[in-house]
Amino acid sequence: MDAARASLLLAGGLAVSTSTSAVATAAQTVSIPHLSPHTRRRRQRRFLRLASAAASSPPPLPAASAQPHCSRWVVVMERPPAPAGGGEVSRAEAVDHYVATLARVLGSQEEAQMRIYDASWDGSYEFSCEIDDEASRDLAKMPGVLAVKPDTDKVDMSEKDNHGSGLSAANLGNFSDAVSNHSSSSGENEFWLVRMEKPGVEVVTKAQMVDHYTQTLMKVLGNEKDAQVSIYHISWERDYGFCCHIDEECAKELADVSGVLSVQPDTNFGSDNKNYKGDDSFKSSEATQAEVKTKRLFVTGLSFYTSEKTLRAAFEPFGELVEVKIIMDKISKRSKGYAFIEYTTEEAGGAALKAMNGQIINGWMIVVDVAKHRSRDRQPPYSASGRSNQVLRSRYHTG
């Protein structure tokens, strides 16, 4: 009976508190019919080893365990397969390849999209994602994956004042040299602190805010790369804004961009202690946006997987829609990441502009602006490198 009880306890994964001698006695008295003496002795010896191991091992962990800790990883990839028509791999094709690779580990394409927060496809092929340690080990075994390593560029946000992020020491030194050289030859300021309106949603990620700031600055500078290298500090949790290196003329233009509260000289350059709070003398973007009247909106920051049906459902509550048009790449037949929305009335367009700017659709924070000309349907903004100005993820250090 004791042996049977010990056997049941072992099968249930519980520790057995019994002496080896007692177990030996029980094992010898167990009747196992239809077995040869040799097989019976072998099973008795195995029973003794299991019981002894169970008696000496610590109790098992509770059934309810904490969720696995997720860390940030940089995944270095081989060059994605060349397009059917030849030529360079486009951004959309590279992102699709990264998502498909990660989805093989996570089991869901949607989950893979949400986990990727940074990507590179121009010259080097890699992406950054937030997954647990076990998933990172599985990912390292996937075909086409060269390496999976911790994302050491990410700095603990608790070490930053006001939850801001600054440059690396090397880059900060380069900017300091630029300040010194510029000050000796000109009295003009080129380092600015930009206060931004709070997004229209309660929860956003750091990567989404970086995208938002980059797209805002792109409206003045004209291309993605210049916007990325100009930003040297961001704030994104309690107060919203960024610091950038631009000339005074661009700073004046930036102050008139939708969502910008103010543009001031960065009087505390070289330090992470920035004042993004401002005061009551700054303009009210609420009042500015309330005066906007437009039927036609330009939406950027869309996920490549957002459909016109999803976009229509998001914008329809503000009024009757005339058109919802996502601009597609003619070769890949995939979304370019931006769209045009048109309402029957200016009131509906103005309400949608105010409410939808900064909202999250399919995990991506969108930017909504007034559509200036219909020609933009045919000619999207391009950077000097020839790539669309739609931002995927910033590739500069943000902490």
From Swiss-Prot:
Subcellular location: Plastid, Chloroplast
InterPro entries assigned: MORF/ORRM1/DAG-like, MORF/ORRM1/DAG-like_MORF, Nucleotide-bd_a/b_plait_sf, RBD_domain_sf, RRM_dom, S8pro/Inhibitor_I9_sf
Major localization listed first in the record, in broad terms: plastid
Pfam families noted in UniProt: MORF_dom, RRM_1
Keywords: Chloroplast, mRNA processing, Plastid, RNA-binding, Transit peptide
Transit peptide segment: 1-52
UniProt keyword Transit peptide, yes or no: yes
GO cellular component, one term: mitochondrion
One BP annotation, GO: mitochondrial mRNA modification
Source species, domain of life: Eukaryota
PANTHER family: MULTIPLE ORGANELLAR RNA EDITING FACTOR 2, CHLOROPLASTIC-RELATED, MULTIPLE ORGANELLAR RNA EDITING FACTOR 2, CHLOROPLASTIC-RELATED-RELATED
Its biological purpose: Involved in C-to-U editing of chloroplastic RNA. Functions as major chloroplastic editing factor. Controls a majority of the chloroplastic editing sites.
Protein name, per record: Organelle RRM domain-containing protein 1, chloroplastic
